[in-house]
C-alpha cells in the first residue's frame, strides 16, 4: 500500500501515531467552537439509591446493568460537547439510563473546554457528587484534575477517551482499532484491492484518532498493498477535511473514502455532488465510502446509496455503562480483565487503568456483508433516537 499525506508520500503510520474518537495523548481533540456550558441539573431516578457497600467485592465478569446497582450517592455527569449528532444522542441517553439504573445525577456541560470541564468537576463535587462521569476531550489537560479528585477519593469514569495519565475507576469506550480495521477491510474488499483512497484522520493527538488511523493504515499495508492511501489529518475539523479532499482530487481520481467521524458526512456528500462525483452504489464511478459513528444521517445516506457503510459507536451504551460503573465504584466493587456479560471485553489501557471496550458493529444497507448489521435494524441506537 502506498500512502500519501498532503500529496507527499510518507508512511501510513509513524512512530508517533498510537490512537483514540471520537474521539489521545496530548492536546484537544477538536478545533470546533465550544458550545455554551449548561447550568447544573439534578435528576432523581424513581428508584432511590441504596447505601454503598462497606467492604469492596470483586465483580468479574461485569454484572448486568439492567437493574439498579448497590452503590448509592449522587453521580456528577459532564456533557463534553453538543456539536454532533453523536454527542447530542449521548446527552439524551444519560437521564434515561439514570432512571433505568436508579441513579441520582447532577449534570453540567463543558462545551469542549478543558478549563470549564475542570471547573465543572470541582463544582459537582462541592455540590455533593460522590462519583463523576466525564468525557475529557483534552486528555492531557484533565490530568491535574484527576489527581485532585483522587486525593478526595472521588471515583471517575471516563467516556470515549483515555486520559494520558491519572487514575480512573473505568474507561468506557468502543474498540477504536476495530473501527479502523473494519473500515479498511470493507473498502479494500469492495475495491478488490486496487485504487486510491482518501482517509479523513481525526486528531492524532487523541487516542481515538490515533487508534483508528493506526489500525486503518496497518490493515491496508498488510492486506491491500496496491491501494494508495491519502492519509489527511483533520483534527476533527470538517472545513480542513474538505480542503484536503479537494487538494487530492485536483490531481487524482479516487475510488474510496474513509471518514473517521460522521461530522464530515454532509459536507463531503455536498462537495462530491457539486463535482459530479457522487454516484449511487452499484453504478459506474461510485466512490466507496465508510463513515464512523452510527447516527441516523449515516443510515439515511446508506439507504440512498451515497454512503456504503458506517461503524456504530454505541452512544446508548456509553451512557448506560458510564453510570453503571460509577454506581459500582460507590458500591466498592472491583473488576478484572476479560469478557463481560454485555458482549464487551475489559482490557488494560495505556496508563494501566481498566477499559471496558464495548462492541461496535459494521452497518451496511442489507447486512449481507459478513459480520455487518442491516441499516434499518431497529436495535441500532441511531434508529431509535429520531
Kindly give the residue locations of the regions a language model identified.
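Venus flytrap/periplasmic-binding-protein-like
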Residues: 157-164, 262, 269-307
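Bacterial lipoprotein signal-peptidase II cleavage site
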Residues: 23-33
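Hinge/beta->alpha junction and helix N-cap segments in small-molecule ligand-binding domains
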Residues: 78-92, 106-116, 137-138, 161, ...
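Short, well-structured alpha-helical segments in soluble
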Residues: 116-129, 239-253
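Hinge/cleft segment of the Venus flytrap/periplasmic-binding protein
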Residues: 71, 208, 219-223, 321-386
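Flexible loop/hinge segments that line or gate small-molecule binding clefts
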Residues: 140-178, 196, 295-303, 307-308
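Bacterial N-terminal signal peptides that target proteins for export
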Residues: 1-13
Amino acid at each position: 500500500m502506498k500512502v500519501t499525506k498532503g500529496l507527499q508520500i510518507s508512511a501510513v503510520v509513524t512512530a508517533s501515531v498510537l490512537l483514540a474518537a471520537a474521539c489521545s495523548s496530548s492536546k484537544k481533540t477538536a478545533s470546533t467552537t465550544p458550545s455554551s456550558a449548561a447550568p447544573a441539573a439534578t435528576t432523581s431516578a424513581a428508584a432511590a439509591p441504596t447505601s454503598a457497600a462497606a467492604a469492596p467485592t470483586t465483580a468479574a465478569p461485569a454484572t448486568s446493568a439492567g437493574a439498579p446497582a448497590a452503590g448509592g450517592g449522587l453521580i456528577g455527569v459532564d456533557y463534553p460537547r453538543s456539536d454532533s449528532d453523536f454527542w447530542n444522542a449521548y446527552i439524551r441517553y444519560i437521564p434515561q439510563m439514570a432512571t433505568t439504573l436508579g441513579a441520582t445525577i447532577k449534570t453540567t456541560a463543558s462545551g469542549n473546554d478543558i478549563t470549564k470541564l475542570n471547573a465543572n468537576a470541582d463544582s459537582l463535587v462541592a455540590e455533593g457528587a460522590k462519583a463523576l462521569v466525564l468525557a475529557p476531550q483534552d486528555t492531557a489537560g484533565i490530568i491535574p484534575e484527576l489527581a485532585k479528585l483522587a486525593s478526595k477519593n472521588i471515583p471517575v469514569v471516563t467516556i470515549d477517551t483515555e486520559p494520558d495519565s491519572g487514575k480512573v475507576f473505568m474507561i468506557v469506550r468502543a474498540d477504536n482499532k476495530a473501527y479502523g480495521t473494519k473500515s479498511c477491510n470493507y473498502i479494500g474488499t469492495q475495491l478488490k484491492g486496487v485504487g486510491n483512497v482518501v482517509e479523513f484522520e481525526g486528531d492524532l493527538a487523541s487516542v481515538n484518532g490515533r487508534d483508528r488511523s493506526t489500525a486503518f493504515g496497518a490493515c491496508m499495508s498488510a492486506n491491500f498493498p496496491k491501494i494508495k492511501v491519502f492519509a489527511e489529518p483533520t483534527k476533527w475539523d470538517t472545513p480542513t477535511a474538505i480542503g484536503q479532499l479537494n487538494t487530492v482530487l485536483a490531481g487524482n481520481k479516487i475510488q474510496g473514502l474513509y471518514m473517521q467521524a460522521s461530522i464530515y458526512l454532509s459536507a463531503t456528500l455536498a462537495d462530491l455532488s457539486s463535482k459530479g462525483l457522487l454516484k449511487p452504489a452499484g453504478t459506474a464511478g461510485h466512490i466507496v465510502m465508510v463513515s464512523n459513528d452510527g447516527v441516523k444521517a449515516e443510515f439515511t445516506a446508506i439507504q440512498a446509496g451515497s454512503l456504503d457503510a458506517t461503524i456504530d459507536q454505541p452512544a446508548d451504551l456509553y451512557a448506560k455503562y458510564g453510570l453503571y460503573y460509577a454506581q459500582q465504584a460507590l458500591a466498592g466493587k472491583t473488576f478484572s480483565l476479560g469478557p463481560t456479560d454485555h458482549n464487551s471485553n475489559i482490557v488494560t489501557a495505556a496508563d494501566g487503568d481498566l477499559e471496558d471496550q464495548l462492541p461496535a458493529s459494521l452497518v451496511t444497507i442489507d447486512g449481507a456483508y459478513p459480520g455487518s448489521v442491516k441499516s434499518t435494524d431497529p436495535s441500532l441506537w441511531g434508529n431509535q433516537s429520531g
